[in-house]
């Protein structure tokens, strides 16, 4: 298949996937513009803008190196994926406007990487010598921001630029984007612009739109007791859970990490799971953590409108599918993940279509996967729409780096895309092999195979042009993966 005719490339997002994509593209000589709705790079690791971060690097102000604000609360249950990013209203109160224009991410006070730094290696920048396996969020943010500066991505990034709409108009893409404008009376509005591009790379991540399950009674409980129920994206500090009994819904990474973070302050932490294949083992919970069954429904026991005192538990019975129930809970935290959503690509969403009924043009149905991509990267009907950063349950930085390398090789003309028929055949084979939904973008345990397939394709073209082959994972990466595997095995056998 003929490669996209590429001169102008837009990258949506300046988290790790966007910085990697833009950096590799710039290295090939392409014209790149990055749109980032925050004031600096970093994505989920974003804390404070460049000026503040650079000014405090030698100071002891690390305690404020994250966004203390909490995002606007999600709907209970969650909105449809295509509506997961409601538009800001012009001339509204500034702080709320900015919460919508550039919502705070899930970064919290004690957030650290849960994958060792050697497994987060990228080709654009090595980790500094002596970097520990585990570091605070501000260290990772600094790493991404330094990479952005060194790779010249910072120079081509439009900050505080929210992408509102991306549409194909003939042979080019039109991106509608806005920046905030503060008026004389401190009211905030948007200045909107439209810019044309040949290729759009979606690198906006999938930790934006909270997935709130439709458990019977949960919406009523939230409506009545408000701040006692929150999504993990809203979590900031463990001290807020002092002497409380906490119910956490979900058994994945965020649930385990936050449970361990609040453990020194909380009384008992109950973790409700559905025994998903992606749940982490119970032994990873802290000593005051207890795993319980899947929730059947919530039952409010009091209809009084009197506010609860801070140390008073919710007048609530939590019923489990096992027939058991639970009382005495002070707070409920939903660690239930996120919708995959691209609200600026609304015409490619089809909220009412089932996974199985998605046609060959739809990108998003129920928010659990992106349809119709070749190698989780190229939109098969139109490869001028590209995605970097979709795989999960993996070692994100390294995988996204290889994706970005492939994109740069294709868009620069070094590597040819397969025909549309060949890409469609590969996609259909993957659907048959792994299934639809959440599992589709998981490459848990198969990272090496995924990267091998990408590099076999790329290096075949490079060899034909007598170009040096692109190398895969380093020996250090393999050593770190084996060490992590042994550590997890020991945890399972506890």
Curated annotation (Swiss-Prot):
Function field: Flavin-containing monooxygenase; part of the gene cluster that mediates the biosynthesis of the secondary metabolite ustiloxin B, an antimitotic tetrapeptide. First, ustA is processed by the subtilisin-like endoprotease Kex2 that is outside the ustiloxin B gene cluster, at the C-terminal side of Arg-Lys, after transfer to Golgi apparatus through the endoplasmic reticulum (ER). Cleavage by KEX2 generates 16 peptides YAIG-I to YAIG-XVI.
Coiled coil stretches, renumbered: none
Organism encoding this protein: Aspergillus flavus (strain ATCC 200026 / FGSC A1120 / IAM 13836 / NRRL 3357 / JCM 12722 / SRRC 167)
Main enzyme class: oxidoreductase
Statement: the UniProt record of this protein carries the keyword Signal: yes
Family named by the database record: Belongs to the FMO family.
Signal peptide location: 1-21
Binding site for NADP(+): 250-255
GO molecular function, one term: NADP binding
Knockout mutant characteristics: Impairs the production of ustiloxin B but accumulates intermediates such as ustiloxin F and C.
Region (Disordered): 73-93
Enzyme Commission number(s) of this protein: 1.8.-.-
Stated name of the protein: Flavin-containing monooxygenase ustF2
A Pfam family assignment: NAD_binding_8
InterPro entries assigned to the protein according to its UniProt record, in alphabetical order: FAD/NAD-bd_sf, Flavin_mOase, Flavin_mOase-like, FMO-like
Positions of FAD binding: 13-18
């Amino acid at each position: 298949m003929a490669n996209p005719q590429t001169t102008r490339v837009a990258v949506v997002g300046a988290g790790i996937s966007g910085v990697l994509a833009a950096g590799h593209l710039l290295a090939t000589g392409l014209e790149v513009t990055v749109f980032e709705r925050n004031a600096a790079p970093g994505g989920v690791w974003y804390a404070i803008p460049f000026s503040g971060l650079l000014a405090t690097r030698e100071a002891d102000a690390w305690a404020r190196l994250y966004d203390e604000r909490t995002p606007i609360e999600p709907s209970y249950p969650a909105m449809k994926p295509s509506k997961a990013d409601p538009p800001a209203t012009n001339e509204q109160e500034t702080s709320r406007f900015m919460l919508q224009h550039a919502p705070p991410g899930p970064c919290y006070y004690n957030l650290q990487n849960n994958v060792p730094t050697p497994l987060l290696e990228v080709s654009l920048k090595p980790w500094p010598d002596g970097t520990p396996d585990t570091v605070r969020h501000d260290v990772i943010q600094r790493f991404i921001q330094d990479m952005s500066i060194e790779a010249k991505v910072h120079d081509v990034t439009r900050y505080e630029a929210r992408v509102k709409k991306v549409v194909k108009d003939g042979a080019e893409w039109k991106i509608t984007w806005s920046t905030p404008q503060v008026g004389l009376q401190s009211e905030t509005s948007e200045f909107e612009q439209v810019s044309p591009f040949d290729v759009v790379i979606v690198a906006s991540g999938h930790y934006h739109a909270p997935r709130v399950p439709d458990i019977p009674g949960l919406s009523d409980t939230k409506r009545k007791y408000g701040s006692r129920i929150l999504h993990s994206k809203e979590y900031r500090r463990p001290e807020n859970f002092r002497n409380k009994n906490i119910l956490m819904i979900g058994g994945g990474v965020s649930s385990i990490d936050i449970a361990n973070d609040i453990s020194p302050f909380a009384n008992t932490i109950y973790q409700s799971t559905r025994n998903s294949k992606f749940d982490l083992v119970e032994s990873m919970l802290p000593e005051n953590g207890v795993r319980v069954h899947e929730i059947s429904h919530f039952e409010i026991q009091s209809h009084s409108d009197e506010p609860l005192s801070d140390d008073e538990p919710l007048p609530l019975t939590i019923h489990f599918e096992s027939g058991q129930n639970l009382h005495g809970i002070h707070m409920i935290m939903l660690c239930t993940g996120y919708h995959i959503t691209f609200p600026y690509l609304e015409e490619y969403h089809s909220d009412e279509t089932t996974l199985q009924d998605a046609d060959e043009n739809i990108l998003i149905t129920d928010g659990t996967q992106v349809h119709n991509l070749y190698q989780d990267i190229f939109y098969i009907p139109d490869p001028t729409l590209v995605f970097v950063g979709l795989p999960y349950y993996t070692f994100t930085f390294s995988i996204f780096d290889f994706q970005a390398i492939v994109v740069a090789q294709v868009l620069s003309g070094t590597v040819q895309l397969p025909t549309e028929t060949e890409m469609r055949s590969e996609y259909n084979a993957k659907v048959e092999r792994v299934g639809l939904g959440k599992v589709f973008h998981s490459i848990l345990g198969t990272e090496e195979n995924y990267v091998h397939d990408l590099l076999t394709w790329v290096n075949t073209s490079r060899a034909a042009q007598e170009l040096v082959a692109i190398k895969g994972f380093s020996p250090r990466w393999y050593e770190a993966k084996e060490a992590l595997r042994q550590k997890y095995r020991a945890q399972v056998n506890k």
